[in-house]
């Protein structure tokens, strides 16, 4: 089956979210994963350490925020030697009109890849500790439950006595939606700040190297 096939690929599975309070249970397969993404991993497995690779990738993989996990894996597996942006019409003769780039990659030694992954995990752990992220999330969860309990008590009447019945009323539903939206915004803001801090720390602490960039003319 497709799921069994995808599970054989690292890029066929969802990556662990370092800002998740609890690990998600159940299947972590990326259903319908793009073949060009899996092709990157297949190339990595075929190459020897220090081996070179030229690969054509849709620009969406290089720019879309939803594809950040692919770019992260690329930088862990390969030294990016060069990126050449191709014209929109480069592969039109083959029926492909997607804007693409050619990446020239060199496979890192295994110990270098492991070192990069370890440093990233270390940065994540320090940011979580310094920001009291888990404690803040736990506190906010407790605040939500307490406010929900207080709201239920305030809505109790002769006709509405049970918490279950009160939570089904339109008044409670509208109030609760506003409450959850308020805390969701606080969580998103904290996550955004930590993500920005992670990128700054990663840029400072991980080894840097030049990448040749070019735009191919039609």
Where are the predicted features?
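A conserved structural/catalytic subdomain of Rossmann-like adenosyl-cofactor enzymes
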Residues: 1-218
């Amino acid at each position: 089956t497709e799921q069994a096939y995808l599970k054989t690929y690292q890029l066929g599975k969802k990556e662990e979210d370092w800002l998740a309070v609890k690990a998600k249970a159940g299947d972590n397969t990326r259903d319908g994963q793009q073949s060009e993404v899996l092709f990157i991993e297949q190339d990595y497995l075929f190459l020897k350490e220090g081996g070179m690779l030229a690969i054509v990738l849709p620009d969406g993989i290089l720019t879309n925020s939803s594809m950040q996990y692919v770019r992260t894996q690329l930088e862990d597996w390969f030294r990016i030697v060069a990126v050449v942006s191709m014209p929109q019409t480069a592969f039109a003769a083959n029926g492909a009109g997607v804007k693409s780039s050619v990446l020239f990659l060199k496979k890192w030694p295994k110990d270098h890849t492991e070192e990069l992954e370890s440093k990233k995990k270390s940065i994540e752990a320090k940011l979580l500790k310094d920001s009291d992220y888990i404690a803040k999330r736990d506190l906010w969860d407790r605040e939500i439950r307490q406010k929900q309990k207080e709201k239920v008590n305030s809505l109790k009447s002769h006709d509405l006595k049970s918490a279950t019945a009160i939570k089904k009323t339109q008044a409670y539903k509208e109030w609760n939606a506003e409450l959850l939206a308020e805390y969701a915004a606080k969580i998103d803001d904290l996550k955004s700040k930590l993500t920005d801090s992670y990128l700054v720390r990663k840029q400072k602490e991980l080894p840097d190297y030049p990448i040749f960039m070019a735009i191919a003319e039609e």
